[in-house]
Amino acid sequence: SGTSGGVWGEEEGYCLMVGGDKEIYEICEPIFEALSADGKGYGYMGKSGSGHFVKMIHNGIEYGMMQSMAEGIEILNQKKEYNLDLTQITELWKSGSVVRSWLLDLLNDALKENPNLDGIAPYVEDSGEGRWTIQEAIDLDVPAHAITSSLYSRFYSRNSDSFSFKVLSSLRNQFGGHNMKKSN
């Protein structure tokens, strides 16, 4: 199955996107329910391969969401005349804001730990799902501007010194335990 939840899933439960034989799914359903977040974070997606396909697209969406969050935080960070407190802002946005989300919670946690993201290189890896999502979009003639742009931004980060890329690297570490490249 396609599985989401990162390092948090072990304690909070996972989101399981299951593909395969429907009869086997039904036999295993109690296991999926037990592993899932709130006993609801699982579902049958269809034939074999469909669960991983849905998870791949999920990760492409995640790329775009994280990129827009990183860009917005970069704009706030660059507006020096206001001396904005990014930790306070992300804490505020967690309550009632349209952009509230688990990713925002994780960004707030990262900023609480390290407000300037000191020591984090602005270098963002990709683990393949964004590339595969874009290839599917190309094959299906579906425009995927945000996902494509977010992947290309990750490529660009490898030759950059931008705060937004430190945000992205921190987010990947927060939700998935992905390695962060440390700055020299």
What are these regions (language model features)?
Residues S1-E71, K79:
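Rossmann-fold dinucleotide-binding core
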Residues E33, K40-K55, Q67-N184:
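NAD(P)-dependent Rossmann-like dehydrogenase/reductase catalytic/cofactor-binding core
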